[in-house]
Amino acid sequence: MRLKSFSLILPCLFGVMFSQIANAQSGENTYKQVCAACHGTGVLNAPKFGDKAKWAPLIAEGQATLTAHAYFGVRGMPPKGGNPNLSIEGFSDAVVYIVNNSGGNWKTPDAKMTAAINKELEVRKAGTKKP
């Protein structure tokens, strides 16, 4: 019975693990294709990838706030990083990738975090909150 239970759980564990790996690769790819042009070089004072000192105050804003504000456009950054076709999911994966390589330790957004990001986006769209 234990072996049968284990054989049922094992695929789920691998599915979660591979999903996280795929999200990390997706975040890295989005970073390279969209974000690196500015965050790789520091253009227009964009915090450079890996610069822990520059990223620390942004990371301190929290995952939902930073992701939503950046997706909406903030501090000279264009909405969606300048790619009008970039989904919030793809953008969120890229933010996690950047943050985790710049001093943070964020997880790929789950349903609860995605809801918090979307709620913060709605607040930004309504113009009731300024960064």
Q: PLM features: residue spans?
A:
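Sec/Tat signal peptide C-region and signal peptidase I cleavage site
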Residues: 17-24
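Axial heme c-ligation environment in periplasmic c-type cytochrome domains
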Residues: 69-93, 98-121
